[in-house]
UniProtKB/Swiss-Prot annotation:
CDD domains assigned to the protein according to its UniProt record, in alphabetical order: Ribosomal_L24e_L24
CC cofactor: Zn(2+)
Cofactor info, note text: Binds 1 zinc ion per subunit.
Family to which this protein belongs: Belongs to the eukaryotic ribosomal protein eL24 family.
Domain of life: Archaea
A GO MF term: structural constituent of ribosome
Species of provenance: Pyrococcus horikoshii (strain ATCC 700860 / DSM 12428 / JCM 9974 / NBRC 100139 / OT-3)
GO cellular component, one term: ribonucleoprotein complex
Annotated keywords: Metal-binding, Ribonucleoprotein, Ribosomal protein, RNA-binding, rRNA-binding, Zinc, Zinc-finger
Record bears the keyword Zinc: yes
Organism phylogeny: Archaea, Methanobacteriati, Methanobacteriota, Thermococci, Thermococcales
Protein name: Large ribosomal subunit protein eL24
Length: 66
């Protein structure tokens, strides 16, 4: 059974056979669940500033749910 991948940008798990795998020149492998995540990553957007990402939700818990 194939394992589920986790999006490198938003942190959402997604099914095998969907999404995109991107391999950088240094050998690091990035998985993207959608074109939106892929585009935001390559534009240099910080996932901690976008409410729909897991990184934002974790950062929010650390800073005290303002």
């Amino acid at each position: 059974m194939a394992r589920w991948n986790i999006c490198s940008y938003c942190g959402k798990p997604f099914e095998p056979g969907t999404g995109k795998m991107y391999v950088r020149n240094d050998g690091r492998v990035l998985f993207f669940c959608s074109r939106k995540c892929e585009r935001y990553y390559f534009m240099g957007r910080n996932p901690r500033k976008l409410k729909w990402t897991k990184a934002y939700q974790e950062a929010r818990l650390q800073r005290g749910k303002r």
